Amino acid sequence: METQIQQAVEIALSGTADPALKSQAYEFIDKIKTSENGLQSCVTILLSSSSVTSEALRFFVLQVVEENIPKVSNERLYSINNSLLQFLRENYIVNHQSYPIYLRNKLASVMATLFCHVYLTINPQFLVQLLEYSSSPPGTDIYVRIHLAIHAEIGDKLIARSPQQQERNNALKDSIRANDMQRLVQSWRSILENAEAHTSDTLTNTVRVVGCYVSWMEISLFVVPDFIGVIFSYLRKPDQRTAACETVAEIISKKMKPENKLQLLALLNITDVVGSLAQDSDDLEFTESVARLANQVGLELLIVFEAQSDSTSEVMNQLMGLWPSVLGFLTHEFDDVAQLVFPYIQQYLLACKKQKTLINNDLLKELFAKCIIKMKFDGDDDGLDDDSAAQFEEIRAKLKTFQDTIAILVPNLYLDLVPAVISESLFSNKPDWQTSELGLYQLSNFADGVRNNLVGVPKKELTTSKAFAVLRELFIQLIDSSVVSSSGHPRVQLSFFELVVRHYTFVASGTNPDPILKVFGSSVGMFNESEKVRLRSWYLFFRFIKLVKPQMSNPSFVEEILLKLQPLLVIKAELPVRDEDDDVVDNGSFSSQLYLFEALGLLIGLMSVDDSTKLRMVDAIFSSLFSSLESCVAASESERNSQPIIPLQAHHALMAIGTFVRGYDDSNVKSGQVMVDKVDNAAQVVVITLSNFAKHEQVREASRFAFARFVPILRDRCTVHLSKLISLIINASNLTVTELSDFLSFLGQLVHTFKGNANVYQLLNDLLTPVVEKIFSLLKYNGENNDFDTMPDVIRDKNGLKKAYMNLLSAIIMNNSSSLLVTESNKAKLPEILSSLFEYSYDLADTTVAKLAVTQLINFVTVLGGSGGKINDPNDTYGESLPAIEGVDEYLIEKSMHLCFELPFQKTEFDLKDAQFRLIAQEISQLIKICYDRKGDTYLQYLSTYLTTMGMAPELMNDFGSSVVKLDNRAFKKYFITFVSQLKSA
């Protein structure tokens, strides 16, 4: 079998082997891994001295042995233990073999796994025997590697383990401490003391072993002067100094009493050591290790400081001695180094907030200055790489927390330094882009600090404080300066616009917005050569107008802006493209263009001028959009169907019209008659466009969007247009499920907006039945191949339509329009509507749909139950005048009663431990309560009869009926949950 294994491994690793043969080899290898004979053959191969045994084969047999160690009997483990120790003896003592590193590491891993399974009971002498094999350089190498692997198995805190594994590992550690600890430490010390006898790798790994084991071994074995001196000597050896740094960090991190920790740190003279190491290397990896060590030293000192009040002066002396190194790392040219001391800086500043004795103004001033230096883009950074800039912003955010904490600790220092930095960065002679950007960034931070009152001014005095006055003056100075207009760097330009939008309250309180609007409209803003800046500034221009809401009394200035922006308002649709992942993505800048239309709508609406002036400006915007739509409509039907760019152009123009009107309406200025007429004209244009593009979903979507924005302005005048719009959409032959869902939300908004409006009521009355029929038609349709019910996406969309449909019913009932459901035009659909609600309630495939259906049944029982089929809503204008619907009362109560008990008790998946089913049960309890509220004792009689047929005990039935009567809604929810739980578990 050994030969077969060797051949199988060779075939499996061959790049030229026949695929069928390779498949057979893999199958054979899998059998070897799981069979006793395979394990024995692998052990035999491992012990073979044959020179033909390849490294790949050795790796494979080691892998098989390792995988089987946890599975075999103790007797087999004993045999494997002896075989592996024999392998070590023959290869590392007798023959001094030198295998590749990956094979040595694999062997170490196998031995570590074996150790975990034999040390406690089968071979307590395991570590002693290992030590015997370390007499040669190769033997010492594998000896140390095995100890590293054992640490990975039992001591590595970064590896998650089960409670059983952790319990085993603790037992292994206890046994090592009791039996082998001193012997092990002495062996490591001996290796390090005799450096000339060992390879560089062996020494490095031994240093690492000390760092790994010190956390759970007796610290006194390591910190004796001779041994600690040996360890520290490796801090000066190029090959081992990085590992030595990590080991020293582990030593000082050892848990101990604060007074002992302070003695240890003093004994090691650790702050001086860190200081000398920090100045002694241009090796980045080592520098990072020293930075980690400095960070750990600082954290340990702070722990001692907080716990030892009588050692304050000594700790502070050591902290002060550490700070020069920390500040040096903070300003290191590589950010990865700087971040390594962030935890210590953060903890130090937090400690300052708790213990004022730690505050040292000179130190905090220097730290503050270093943070500012680190916040500046590097001189060789062009600032154009978004990924690297995003990483830098994360670092800045952490540095900002340090700045803010210093502001809280020493407000006067903050108020002196930050404005000076801002002024020097922004208003000095021709600063480079990095300096200007830093100034804008600091100004934004300063504004945040003032708004969040970091300097601790009484809230009522904030707007009259020195900080507020300084900030406002800086904003005025910035806006009056040429900092942005003279800068050609995109990051400076964007930073300015982001700044004035983010801190618009300060801008609005102390400056005239006109200069800012001019900058927006310049070549550094909305006409910027950089697409990123240009498109972002369009959005920020809109945000600025929306937030500041400038009261524009000078029409010529607004007309100047409008005229200047005309080139940007030209809509030219571009077909979507596919990205590198083959996903369809929008092409062009239309989505950003919409912000311009909304901003101009706002700006014109905010103007303090007569309507005729506003109308002139609106015409300037609408005329080009209407002209674009006219061109689209003029295209022949064949052109519209064959050239997708035409309906897309129509969609864009309609969206622009709707977005502009939304902006105008958001100005909260009451629209005069001329503006209402203009929007009414736009509504006509939309309907005409839709009638010509009724087959195109994107045009239907844009038309619906536009009308939703027209409604608040047109009010009653929109009904004629709405009737046509709704008919065109509902009658579209290719109406999709998701589109209808969105459309139902639009109808729900109409119901709410025009509650009590006779014209809209009549409109909805005429259209409700066709809408409901369309809903049921799309829900029923199962695709040409009758397979929609197997497609998750379709199921999800249909559930979305069910929710939208029920939300529309809810809107009708909650807005006192329930009579719509029982008018002569619509009452024929009522049975189908009610039947659908019961159907959805019983279907638990989507619990949110089921819960919503039960909620709607509560609504229907409220308005139609217990009143003989008449509408029970005094605020429904038409409810009283409509005749009763015979039988609906009894139907609702009887079907609801069946639902309330069949759903929780007959549906096996109804599990009250599931939060979703618990919510449904709570809704059912409210349905029971509302049925009782509407029918009173009659309902209790129905209930008694029904529960008797269910076989419920009289005592339990009486208790249930009593609870229905006596408990309020909240208490009955809890009762019903308990009731169902007890019965289901009985």
Curated annotation (Swiss-Prot):
Subcellular location, in the record's words? Nucleus; Cytoplasm
Per its UniProt record, what Pfam families does this chain match? Exportin-T (PF19282), Xpo1 (PF08389)
One of the entry's Gene Ontology molecular-function terms is: small GTPase binding
Q: What InterPro entries does the annotation carry?
A: ARM-like, ARM-type_fold, Exportin-1/Importin-b-like, Exportin-T_C, XPOT
Its GO CC terms are:
cytoplasm; nuclear matrix; nuclear pore
Q: Could you list this entry's UniProt keywords, alphabetically sorted.
A: Cytoplasm, Nucleus, RNA-binding, Transport, tRNA processing, tRNA-binding
SUPFAM superfamilies from the xrefs?
A: ARM repeat (SSF48371)
Please provide the Gene Ontology terms (biological process) for this protein. tRNA processing; tRNA re-export from nucleus
Do the record's keywords include Plastid?
A: no
Keyword Nucleus belongs to the record: yes
The entry's family comment says: Belongs to the exportin family.
The function of this protein is: tRNA nucleus export receptor which facilitates tRNA translocation across the nuclear pore complex. Involved in pre-tRNA splicing, probably by affecting the interaction of pre-tRNA with splicing endonuclease.
Q: What's the protein here called?
A: Exportin-T
Q: Which organism is it from?
A: Meyerozyma guilliermondii (strain ATCC 6260 / CBS 566 / DSM 6381 / JCM 1539 / NBRC 10279 / NRRL Y-324)
